[in-house]
Amino acid sequence: MFANIGWWEMLVLVMVGLVVLGPERLPGAIRWAASALRQARDYLSGVTSQLREDIGPEFDDLRGHLGELQKLRGMTPRAALTKHLLDGDDSLFTGDFDRPTPKKPDAAGSAGPDATEQIGAGPIPFDSDAT
């Protein structure tokens, strides 16, 4: 909850508390805030343990599914589209169409002949009418 508060922010909060509450009421306010946070943390840990007891072994499955949703939540729409629909090939978005795609073996287990094997080791064919 307060993970993003640094030392400078904490110092500013204490100074504002000194101005607003005064030096005689500030220690009591700090004690009250600390006890309220401690009670809230204890309540939330109790709810988690109660839920774990009520649901049983399915609780771990539920946490796994929630973890997967959390991973998807952090993705941008472009990353989700690239990962799930395009199998990680983002050349559609980057315009890098000349990049070789990784070859997947076919059902027989061989990747098939390369384009260099089909052309041969001779000179590169040139068509003067094509240019």
Swiss-Prot record:
Basic and acidic residues compositional bias, start-end: 96-106
Subcellular location: Cell membrane
Region (Disordered): 90-131
GO cellular component: TAT protein transport complex
Loss of function: phenotype: Essential for growth.
Main localisation: membrane
Superkingdom in the source lineage: Bacteria
Membrane-spanning intervals of the chain: 2-22
Described purpose of this protein according to its UniProt entry: Part of the twin-arginine translocation (Tat) system that transports large folded proteins containing a characteristic twin-arginine motif in their signal peptide across membranes. Together with TatC, TatB is part of a receptor directly interacting with Tat signal peptides. TatB may form an oligomeric binding site that transiently accommodates folded Tat precursor proteins before their translocation.
Recorded topology in the membrane: Single-pass membrane protein
The keyword Secreted is assigned to this record: no
Keywords: Cell membrane, Membrane, Protein transport, Translocation, Transmembrane, Transmembrane helix, Transport
Gene coding for it: tatB
Quaternary structure (record): The Tat system comprises two distinct complexes: a TatABC complex, containing multiple copies of TatA, TatB and TatC subunits, and a separate TatA complex, containing only TatA subunits. Substrates initially bind to the TatABC complex, which probably triggers association of the separate TatA complex to form the active translocon.
Name by which UniProt lists this protein: Sec-independent protein translocase protein TatB
